[in-house]
Amino acid sequence: MKFAVIQFPGSNCDLDMLHAIRDSLGEEAEYVWHAETSLEGFDAVLLPGGFSYGDYLRTGAIAKFSSIMPEVLRFAETGKPVLGVCNGFQILTEIGLLPGALIRNNNLHFICKTVPLRVVNGNTIFTGLYEDNEVIHVPVAHGEGNYYCDDETLLKLKENNQIVFTYDSVNPNGSRADIAGIVNERGNVLGMMPHPERAVEDIIGGTDGLRLFQSIVQAWKEEQVNA
């Protein structure tokens, strides 16, 4: 399986993502610069964390207009996996692949720590190797990770089982309904604020994030068998 790691000016978690895929997962991964216009040959797209374009205007607002983004939209429309982490999640909301928005943390401070997450939906291509309601531990590092949406959108997310991860015990940023990660209605686009790529080795604190990437590979292999 081959992963594309999209690089924007200001990305700083792209190396972590590449390492997670190549070294911990044992799959192929390549950087794709934001000015490129093709994702041909890739099976999954990863939008990493960081501060794309310096977070000017607002997080993800300028990345929305990068040359690669129309291709990311087309890629998602084919049903292939798209994962946006932290700034990547913010970008996914900006381009309309996911509903809602990410705003300033309610304490107005940058947060960097490992937090407990509850797997609300274990029946997605991203969570197939987790149990429903399992509590895992994954790092967060953000200043604008407070997920917001209106009441109608929140109701729709709940009805469609689109909420995949919630913060457990303590909500670190004020997100509505403790939301940490959501998928689109089709289930092939996941945005999450916590960093699974930083939880892939015991030596750096745990491997709870590795199963997310393993789940993607498992779903892809099953699709190849059934094709």
Swiss-Prot record:
GO terms for molecular function: ATP binding; glutaminase activity; phosphoribosylformylglycinamidine synthase activity. InterPro entries: Class_I_gatase-like (IPR029062), PRibForGlyAmidine_synth_PurQ (IPR010075). Its EC number is 6.3.5.3, 3.5.1.2. CDD domains: GATase1_FGAR_AT. The active site is at 86 (nucleophile), 195, 197. SMART domains: GATase_5 (SM01211). It is found in: Cytoplasm. Transmembrane segments: none annotated. Keywords: ATP-binding, Cytoplasm, Glutamine amidotransferase, Hydrolase, Ligase, Nucleotide-binding, Purine biosynthesis. Residues 2-226 form the Glutamine amidotransferase type-1 domain. Pathway: Purine metabolism; IMP biosynthesis via de novo pathway; 5-amino-1-(5-phospho-D-ribosyl)imidazole from N(2)-formyl-N(1)-(5-phospho-D-ribosyl)glycinamide: step 1/2. The keyword Ligase applies. Its main location: cytoplasm. One of its GO terms (biological process) is 'de novo' IMP biosynthetic process. It catalyses: N(2)-formyl-N(1)-(5-phospho-beta-D-ribosyl)glycinamide + L-glutamine + ATP + H2O = 2-formamido-N(1)-(5-O-phospho-beta-D-ribosyl)acetamidine + L-glutamate + ADP + phosphate + H(+); L-glutamine + H2O = L-glutamate + NH4(+). GO terms for cellular component: cytoplasm. NCBIfam families: FGAM_synth_I (TIGR01737), PRK03619.1 (NF002957). Part of the phosphoribosylformylglycinamidine synthase complex involved in the purines biosynthetic pathway. Catalyzes the ATP-dependent conversion of formylglycinamide ribonucleotide (FGAR) and glutamine to yield formylglycinamidine ribonucleotide (FGAM) and glutamate. The FGAM synthase complex is composed of three subunits. PurQ produces an ammonia molecule by converting glutamine to glutamate. PurL transfers the ammonia molecule to FGAR to form FGAM in an ATP-dependent manner. Part of the FGAM synthase complex composed of 1 PurL, 1 PurQ and 2 PurS subunits. This is Phosphoribosylformylglycinamidine synthase subunit PurQ. The gene is purQ.
